[in-house]
């Protein structure tokens, strides 16, 4: 085999290996950030939902809560939306669902944001994450990859950080684990 042929075979293999190495490293970093949030108190935050109500950590104390981060241009967010809708509609009275949309800080066009919210058809409040909110979560070294679902106990401690596309069963299991 000529040197040119060997080089032509070797370079693509190196590039593929580098790609998988980098993506694995990024995934591991994000997973570490998510796990960093578990067993930590929910940061003190204030965000306004689309109906004008201001929500804070204090509104969640005494109830189980689910903070579901999503955005436009997120395929996994679209795929999981029916399961998330079903879960929020079946939620117990002691469970608060809040959807946190990150479009504003990502400079997504407002019409696309409106289209995404209409398509999702969530019945629980949708909060629009602002720079201050995102900075608060960055300071706490949390991940805001989307989709991500944080399940919080009645004392305000995060018990689960569920990364990526979630099934009804996975979220139900997390909620059941923080039943007490």
Predicted feature residues:
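Structural microenvironment flanking redox-active thiols in thiol-disulfide oxidoreductases
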Residues: 78-120, 131-137
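Short loop/turn microsegments at loop-to-beta-strand junctions
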Residues: 42-43, 65, 146-147
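N-terminal targeting signals for export/organelle localization
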Residues: 1-44, 180
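Short active-site neighborhood of thiol/selenol oxidoreductases, capturing the structured segment around
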Residues: 55-78
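Hydrophobic beta-strand anchors of alpha/beta hydrolase catalytic cores
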Residues: 66-67, 97, 149
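Short histidine/acidic/glycine/proline-rich micro-motifs that form metal-
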Residues: 16-19, 73-75, 101-106
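Thiol/disulfide oxidoreductase modules built on the thioredoxin-like
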Residues: 120-122, 129-177
């Amino acid at each position: 085999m000529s040197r040119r042929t060997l080089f032509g075979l070797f370079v693509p293999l190196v590039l593929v290996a580098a790609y998988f190495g980098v993506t694995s490293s990024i995934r591991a970093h994000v997973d570490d950030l998510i796990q960093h949030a578990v067993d930590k108190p929910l940061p003190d935050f204030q965000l306004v939902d689309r109906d004008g109500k201001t929500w804070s950590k204090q509104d969640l104390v005494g109830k189980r809560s689910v903070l579901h981060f999503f955005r436009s241009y997120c395929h996994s967010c679209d795929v999981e939306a029916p399961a998330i809708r079903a879960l929020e509609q079946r939620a117990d009275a002691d469970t608060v669902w809040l959807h946190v949309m990150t479009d504003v800080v990502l400079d997504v066009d407002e019409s696309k944001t409106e289209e995404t919210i209409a398509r999702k058809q969530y019945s629980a409040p949708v909060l629009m994450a602002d720079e201050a909110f995102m900075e608060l979560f960055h300071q706490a070294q949390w991940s805001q990859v989307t989709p991500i679902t944080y399940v919080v106990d009645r004392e305000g401690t995060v018990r689960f950080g569920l990364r990526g596309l979630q099934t009804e069963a996975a979220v139900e299991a997390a909620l059941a684990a923080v039943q007490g």
